[in-house]
């Protein structure tokens, strides 16, 4: 049976540091480092992944590449007094994953668009790059698309800031089910309130 074009792309991206893709990624990162933190792109870098997540090559659909610095939260040192245990600076991490941060930054720049989803496209020693798929809820092409028009409803405003995307749900622990997830739903904060 003949393999699809997308299956070849997917196989290449399983190990992007090997084969022909490695050279291409090396050249891409050289260009990406010179660009801004948020850049609109004409077409997805990973077409198979973008299509899986709902991308369509039509008006009203925008793809944005976002770079996010890797590492811990870079907290500034407290100026006021604290006991040693509460003086933590160096090993304080972020509560959100980098992919969710990238989605939020893209959404803040393109305030009239709504974030559908995002995916990883590369990283080096200091930063990670993600591509976010954004939709225009006011565009007729989106409103008339049976697969995408759900996002036009007002209940999906600012969905990325409420942890409604895949990356947001992952950070909230909602991709897990069964034993051990009792405190995750409806949210960790709500669970703490109910127990107090």
Swiss-Prot record:
GO terms for cellular component: cytosolic large ribosomal subunit. Pfam families: Ribosomal_L15e. GO terms for molecular function: RNA binding; structural constituent of ribosome. Residues 162-172 have a biased composition (Basic residues). GO terms for biological process: cytoplasmic translation. Residues 162-196 are annotated as: Disordered. The keyword Ribonucleoprotein applies. InterPro entries: Rbsml_eL15_core_dom_sf (IPR024794), Ribosomal_eL15 (IPR000439), Ribosomal_eL15_arc (IPR020926), Ribosomal_eL15_CS (IPR020925), Ribosomal_uL23/eL15/eS24_sf (IPR012678). Keywords: Ribonucleoprotein, Ribosomal protein. SUPFAM superfamilies: Ribosomal proteins S24e, L23 and L15e (SSF54189). SMART domains: Ribosomal_L15e. It comes from the Archaea. NCBIfam families: PRK04243.1. Belongs to the eukaryotic ribosomal protein eL15 family. This is Large ribosomal subunit protein eL15. It comes from Halobacterium salinarum (strain ATCC 700922 / JCM 11081 / NRC-1).
